[in-house]
């Protein structure tokens, strides 16, 4: 599990793209020239940006070679760069920085977010969506299984919170629109939940384990999911998935 798996990630493409669609709908920009898609993955969010602004120069940035290769294949009209978001520098100031489900993986948001704002043109927009599920059973159970099996904590840090992000971006000179939405995804089985998180949140926990260790981890994780996520009357499982949305417009 040394690299991201585009096919596994796209297995739930509709569910993963829906927050990007809703974030994009709140971006108050019309004719723009320069766009960056931070953590573009296989290009599903980049495609939405290209559809809305076909004449813009859109650059997707991702640290995964596999994801970048998939995105380049799918969107030859866009530019893609394999790079760390924290170190990447655009060639010119940007009109829009779009980050759908990527910045939660990076530390030091008190420094990162003002840095990203500094890359914008005046009236430019930073649009961010981040999973806010650190306290959801899916993620709590990852930590519990790791503790039971004596593995180190490899989960990401919790988000800073609504009030913190508002203050960070306001102090950076932005007008801020911020909201939180909980999606309830219909999952056919507990294994489907595992398939979902294996492509994202579960990766850090599994990537350094042997195959047998991964099997033991996932077996216990599956047992604990069954305890926390009951079946509905029709046999489906409702997976609650909170997400935090931010649209910050640089007013300088």
From Swiss-Prot:
Superkingdom of the source species: Bacteria
Catalyses which reaction(s): trans-aconitate + S-adenosyl-L-methionine = (E)-3-(methoxycarbonyl)pent-2-enedioate + S-adenosyl-L-homocysteine
GO BP of this protein: methylation
Pfam families the UniProt entry points to: Methyltransf_25
GO cellular component: cytoplasm
CDD domains, sorted: AdoMet_MTases (cd02440)
Localization per record: Cytoplasm
GO terms for MF: trans-aconitate 2-methyltransferase activity
UniProt-listed SUPFAM superfamilies: S-adenosyl-L-methionine-dependent methyltransferases
NCBIfam families listed in its UniProt record: PRK01683.1
Family membership: Belongs to the methyltransferase superfamily. Tam family.
Protein's name in the database: Trans-aconitate 2-methyltransferase
Organism: Escherichia coli O139:H28 (strain E24377A / ETEC)
Lineage of producing organism: Bacteria, Pseudomonadati, Pseudomonadota, Gammaproteobacteria, Enterobacterales
């Amino acid at each position: 599990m040394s690299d991201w798996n585009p096919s596994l990630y796209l297995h739930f493409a509709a569910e993963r793209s829906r927050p990007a669609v809703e974030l994009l709908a709140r971006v108050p920009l019309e004719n723009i020239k320069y766009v960056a898609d931070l953590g573009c993955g296989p290009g599903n969010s980049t495609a939405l940006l290209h559809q809305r602004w076909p004449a813009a120069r859109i650059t997707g940035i991702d640290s995964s070679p596999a994801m970048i290769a998939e995105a380049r294949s799918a969107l030859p009209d866009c530019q893609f760069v394999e790079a760390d978001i924290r170190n990447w520098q655009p060639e010119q100031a940007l009109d829009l920085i779009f980050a759908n489900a990527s910045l939660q993986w990076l530390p030091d948001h008190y420094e990162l977010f003002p840095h990203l704002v500094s890359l914008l043109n005046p009236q430019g927009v930073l649009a961010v969506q981040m999973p806010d599920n650190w306290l959801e059973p899916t993620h709590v159970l990852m930590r519990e299984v790791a503790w039971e099996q004596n593995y180190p904590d490899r989960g990401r840090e919790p988000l800073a919170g609504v009030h913190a992000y508002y203050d960070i971006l306001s102090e950076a000179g932005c007008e801020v629109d911020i909201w939180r939405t909980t999606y309830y995804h219909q999952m056919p089985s507990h294994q489907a939940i595992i398939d979902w998180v294996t492509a994202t949140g579960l990766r850090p926990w599994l990537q350094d384990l042997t195959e047998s260790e991964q099997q033991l981890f996932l077996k216990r994780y599956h047992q604990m999911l069954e305890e926390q996520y009951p079946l509905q009357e029709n046999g489906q499982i409702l997976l609650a998935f909170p997400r935090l949305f931010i649209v910050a417009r640089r007013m300088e």
